[in-house]
Amino acid sequence: MAKKGSISSRNLRISDQIQKDLAEMIQRELRDPRLGLVTLQSVALTPDYAHAKVYFTVLGAEAAEAEAILNEKAGYLHSLLYKRLHIHTVPTLRFFHDTSVEHAIEMSKLINEANATRSKDD
């Protein structure tokens, strides 16, 4: 039995499958030129599988606009997902722009600057 607060292996498997299927559907079914190149980073499911937070990054488009478009199309993507997945409850989808990549780049820049300053002082 899983510990309280831990994510079950079934939850992880379903999250991974949803991520793969959604990535394919966004690329093949939406074909919205305003989206640019969308990459799904992760899917977080609630324990009852009723809701999914889908985190994405985007290239070639404004993140806020891409988030709005994806959330607008969430119902359509949900219906496509329902046809693909063979589970009792297909979660409602909510899309969020993942800013962790930008934060990692910023942190890397700061570390490089600190190292450059330190080497000048030596």
Curated annotation (Swiss-Prot):
Keywords: Cytoplasm, Ribosome biogenesis. Its main location: cytoplasm. The keyword Cytoplasm applies. GO terms for biological process: maturation of SSU-rRNA. The keyword Cytoplasm applies. GO terms for molecular function: ribosomal small subunit binding. Gene3D superfamilies: 3.30.300.20. One of its GO terms (cellular component) is cytosol. It is found in: Cytoplasm. Belongs to the RbfA family. One of several proteins that assist in the late maturation steps of the functional core of the 30S ribosomal subunit. Associates with free 30S ribosomal subunits (but not with 30S subunits that are part of 70S ribosomes or polysomes). Required for efficient processing of 16S rRNA. May interact with the 5'-terminal helix region of 16S rRNA. Monomer. Binds 30S ribosomal subunits, but not 50S ribosomal subunits or 70S ribosomes. This is Ribosome-binding factor A. It comes from Cupriavidus necator (strain ATCC 17699 / DSM 428 / KCTC 22496 / NCIMB 10442 / H16 / Stanier 337) (Ralstonia eutropha). The gene is rbfA.
